[in-house]
Amino acid sequence: RPCYIVSVGNYKTELKAADFETAFAPLEKEAEPTMIVIPEAVNLADADCYALQQKMVEHCNKMMSRISILDVFIDKYPANPAVKVDYVDKFRNGFSTNFPSYAAAYYPYLNTSVLSDTDITDSMIVLKDNVTDFIMHIGWEEAMIASFTAAFLKEGSSGEMTKDINQALLQNSVVYQQLIKAVKYDLNLLSPSAAIAGVYCSVDNSRGVWKAPANVTINSVVKPSATINDYEQEELNVPITGKAVNAIRTFPGEGIKVWGARTLDGNSQDWRYVNVRRTMIYLEQSVKNA
């Protein structure tokens, strides 16, 4: 099954919501995509993330051949970590659409094992940016950031020199070890939408589009970033507003599973389930293209 990747910029430039919105026009010319995923949307401010997600759903309604997989925005670097925030409630209040059956939302983020220590130290740009974020978050001075960058992350440094410095620091510097550990944790804490797209494809291939993409294990995940119990699951799945959010949960002896397959149109008798909406899309497009 092909995957269409639409470039909206590069890794050195901070992207804005408007940059991501340029991806929709090229996709309107393509008939094959059956789902839209923008995992990077959560890197925007919360309001911009919700606005971009609304554009995703509008695009899906316009095309009538695909569905949006959305992440519930979580602030990875809150101004006051001691204050508990209900991000699901913020999502329900901040995101709105007239076409809820064309979207499904998932929560929480996933602590993954995708990147190793070697993957992190091999990427100078990523290391520089994330070390800077981490140092700023814990309150160190900008002068220390500049010193760290000048000493260890110079453009044009040879691979062997960088490797030697990295090994020396890992063996002798507790602070550096903590930085690498923090960067590794940060980079491996991923929003779930990309993984959920993989779950959809896996279920499509093994069973069919009519099968609910739920009760399915996700690979390369250590644990969800939040623990959800049965009571919280019920509130996520069947809210009064109908904006259902699908949970990702850990079950003893079974591992980590996607536990829900509802669209954001939870109060609809016809379109509350992802597999029903996607099956109808499949049938409509099959007839249209016959």
Task: Describe the role of every protein-language-model region.
Residues 1-290:
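A glycine- and small-residue-enriched flexible loop/hinge signal that marks low-structured segments
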